[in-house]
Amino acid sequence: KEGYNVYVYSIGNFPTLRCMEQIRYDVAYHNLNVKIVSVGAGYAYGSLGASHHATEELGMMRTIPNMVICSPGDPVEAQVISTVSANYEGPMYLRLGKAGEVIVHQSLIENLKIGDLIPVIRKPNANKALLVSGSILDYAVNRIREFNDLSDVYSIPFVKPLNIEQLHELAIQYPDICVLEEHQKSCGVGSAIIEVINDMYSRSEIPYYPRIKRIAIDDKFYSVSGSQAYLRKLANLVL
C-alpha cells in the first residue's frame, strides 16, 4: 500500500552496505518516505568481528542524493530524532548504538531541526571546539570534564545535511576544531565538515582556515573480536 512512513531495521552493515544498490535506485532516486534504521554503530558489535563493525557505511550513505543521515549521541537525541524522522517526508538513515548508551543530556532537546549541532558543554574562556558524532559522545564529555580542557563540546546528530550557519559561526569563533567519530576517517563526519569549511574559505566567507584535527578510524580493518571499548582504544579513538 502507498502512503505509509516505512521503517526498515537491522544490525549495522546489513540494511546499508549489503543493499546499497537498492537504497540508491529504489528509495533515494524516487525520494521515497523510507527510514533505514541500523543498530550497532561503529564497534558496538565488536565481539562479532569485522563483518559486524559498522565503520564505513556513513561515507557510502552520505554520497547518495536525497538521503538525510542521523547519528544521535545519546538516548535523548535518539528520542527527538525519532520524532523528527516521523515528521520528515523522504529517505533518512538513522545510525544508532546498541543498548545501554549513557544519557548525556539531562533535559529534553526542543526545536531541533535537521542539520542542527547541539551544544553540550560551553565555557566562557573556551578556545577550541570538540565536535562529536554518535554514541562516543559520553566518552568525549567525560574526558573534557576530567582534564578540565578549555574546549566547548558539540554533538553532531545529523551528518547530512549540516547546519551551514552554525558551522560558519564555529569556524570564525574557534581557531582549533577537533572532530571525534567512530567511523572511517575517509568520507566520515570530519570529512563532511572539512568540505563545508573549505568551501566557505574558498568563497572568502571566513577570514582564516581553522586547524581541524580528525580523530577517526584509519584506513584499515581490525580483524579481531573484542568489546567496543577495547576496539575504540585499538583504533586510537582517544582524547
What does each model-found stretch correspond to?
Residues 45, 97-239:
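Thiamine diphosphate
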Residues 1-129:
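Conserved thiamine diphosphate
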